[in-house]
């Protein structure tokens, strides 16, 4: 979130998965967009079948909040492959909103139980948007 008139990122609050986003992460949005939950059969971007739904969501939250995770701006001015990568939180120079006024999103990557996980976070908006394993 930000404090005051100047755009200053403050990343001292935990990013959490809302109930709506929990359903999205685990179950997806339908047959063409299956979820990433354990035992959902979504291939290499599903959480391990040996994990519970709660384990998967905790892993997503842990990566989003880890001081070791790598953050990169994914939407808004200055986003993309050349956007700076920061460790443990968003780039303090990143804008708060896109040109359309939507909250800027960040790609956050880290590990949990030796599993590489990618999380999409809106620090100035919804918080954790989605999360899933990568490189499986």
Feature-to-residue mapping (PLM):
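Helix-centric, low-specificity signal for extended rod-like, repetitive segments
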Residues: 14-15, 33
């Amino acid at each position: 979130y930000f404090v005051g008139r100047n755009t200053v990122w403050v990343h001292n609050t935990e990013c959490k998965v809302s109930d709506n986003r929990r359903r999205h992460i685990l179950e997806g949005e339908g047959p063409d967009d299956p979820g990433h939950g354990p035992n959902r059969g979504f291939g290499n971007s599903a959480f391990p079948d040996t994990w519970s739904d709660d384990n998967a969501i905790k892993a997503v939250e842990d990566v989003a909040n880890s001081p070791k995770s790598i953050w990169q701006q994914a939407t808004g001015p200055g986003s993309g492959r050349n956007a700076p990568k920061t460790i443990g939180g968003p780039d303090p120079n990143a804008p708060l909103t896109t040109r359309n006024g939507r909250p800027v999103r960040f790609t956050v990557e880290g590990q949990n139980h030796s599993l590489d996980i990618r999380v999409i976070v809106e620090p100035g908006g919804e918080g954790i948007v989605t999360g899933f394993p990568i490189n499986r």
